[in-house]
């Protein structure tokens, strides 16, 4: 498929025009015209770029690309090395950030819910483009049980901040993959029993303790593996691309 046709297909699927983002979504660095082999991964790090080159990929498809709002505009240093390597190897770079978080089937939030056994009830912000979700478990569980489940699914032990009432059972839950810790306030105002995200701030601890809500910091990278993986699998199954997902270790 032509690289611009692939971008059009991804745009049609993920609808980036529907949500305001902090970076451009779509084809960020243009490479060879014909795309057959794609490598997917969470972040367009040099390690992932080199792995894609080793596999003779035509395109790299990621969740975290380049050209973020308020980042230095000059193409130099680490940013310069990455982009120069892409261009020298004629490697296309496609990136989809918030549109991939919120897709109802392929998105990071949807994929995490599926793996944790969460029944999705809706968007925490109350509109279709909400980047945080809420739902429920069919069977209530303790904070320790949910922490264990998260650890088993993501292969990473989460940081669990229990509320002052530590034995509170969890039936209703909110979540936002990546850096969505501040959505705990919306979750608490809705009266949810728990909130899950990738990261945690110092203030999150007190929000959890004082508002009677369990908080689980499960890892930015770990919570966002599965959307880009699902998108690649969809491209392979429905459009015949040769797709390889590569998970570059990141403990954050």
UniProtKB/Swiss-Prot annotation:
Homohexamer. Keywords: Metal-binding. It comes from Vibrio cholerae serotype O1 (strain ATCC 39315 / El Tor Inaba N16961). Transmembrane segments: none annotated. One of its GO terms (cellular component) is cytoplasm. A divalent metal cation 1 binds at residues 63, 101, 224. A divalent metal cation 2 binds at residues 64, 220, 224. GO terms for molecular function: metal ion binding. Belongs to the GTP cyclohydrolase I type 2/NIF3 family. This is GTP cyclohydrolase 1 type 2 homolog. The keyword Metal-binding applies.
């Amino acid at each position: 498929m032509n690289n611009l046709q692939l971008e059009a297909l991804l745009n049609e699927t993920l609808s980036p025009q529907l949500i305001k983002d902090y970076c451009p979504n779509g084809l960020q660095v243009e490479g060879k015209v014909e795309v057959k082999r794609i490598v997917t991964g969470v972040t367009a790090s040099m390690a992932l770029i080199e792995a894609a080159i080793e596999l003779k990929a035509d395109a790299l498809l990621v969740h975290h690309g380049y050209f973020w709002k308020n980042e230095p505009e000059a193409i130099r240093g680490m940013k310069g090395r990455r982009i120069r390597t892409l261009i020298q190897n004629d490697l296309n770079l496609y990136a989809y950030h918030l549109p991939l978080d919120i897709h109802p089937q392929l998105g990071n939030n949807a994929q995490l819910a599926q793996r944790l056994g969460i029944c999705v009830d809706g968007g925490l912000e109350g509109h279709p483009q909400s980047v945080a979700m809420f739902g429920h478990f069919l069977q209530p569980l303790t904070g320790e049980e949910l922490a264990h489940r998260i650890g088993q699914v993501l292969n990473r032990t989460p940081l669990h901040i229990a509320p002052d009432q530590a034995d509170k059972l969890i039936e209703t839950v909110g979540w936002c993959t990546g850096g969505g810790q501040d959505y705990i306030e919306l979750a608490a105002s809705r009266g949810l029993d728990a909130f899950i995200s990738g990261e945690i701030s110092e203030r999150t601890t007190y929000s959890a303790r004082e508002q009677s809500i369990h908080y689980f910091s499960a890892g930015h990278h770990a919570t966002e593996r599965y959307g880009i993986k699902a998108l690649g699998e969809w491209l392979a199954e429905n459009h015949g691309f040769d797709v390889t997902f590569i998970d570059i270790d990141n403990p954050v």
